[in-house]
């Protein structure tokens, strides 16, 4: 069975969702220590920035309540770096987050 190690408590990266219906590109900054996820969506130019503040339970952009705990993200064991496309957080294809390349230390 696939296992996942958690990512470092603080990271940032680029998100690419390739889809004919709703493609997406975003920059994400994640801090488990501050319990915040900062997301800027793009379509050529920045469209919107949201901030999920799990410390206060508030989501900013359109202010709304935020419930639950901050999500953790994982990297599968024995993942070479860089390694091409991999799904993180799921044991089966298409059940997690697709990552095209992972750079960094485990």
UniProtKB/Swiss-Prot annotation:
Query: According to the lineage, what is the superkingdom?
Result: Eukaryota
Q: Which residues are glycosylated?
A: 65
Instruction: Describe the temperature dependence.
Output: Thermostable. Retains hemagglutinating activity after incubation at 60 degrees Celsius for 1 hour. At higher temperatures activity drops drastically.
Show the stretches that span the lipid bilayer: none
Q: How does activity depend on pH?
A: Optimum pH is 6-7 for hemagglutinating activity. Activity drops rapidly at lower or higher pH.
Q: Which UniProt keywords apply?
A: Glycoprotein, Lectin
MF terms in GO:
carbohydrate binding
Kindly provide the PTM information from the record: Glycosylated.
Biological role: Lectin with affinity for N-acetyl-galactosamine, carragenan and glycoprotein porcine stomach mucin (PSM). Has metal-independent hemagglutinating activity towards erythrocytes from rabbit and human. Hemagglutinating activity is not inhibited by D-galactose, D-glucose, D-mannose, D-fucose, methyl-alpha-D-galactopyranoside, methyl-alpha-D-glucopyranoside, N-acetyl-glucosamine, N-acetyl-mannosamine, D-fructose, alpha-D-lactose, beta-D-lactose, D-lactulose, D-sucrose, fucoidan or glycoproteins thyroglobulin and ovalmucoid.
What is said about its interaction partners and assembly?
Answer: Probable heterotrimer consisting of an alpha chain and two beta chains. The alpha chain can probably have different glycosylation states.
What is the protein name for this chain?
Halilectin 3, beta chain
**What organism is the protein native to?**
Haliclona caerulea
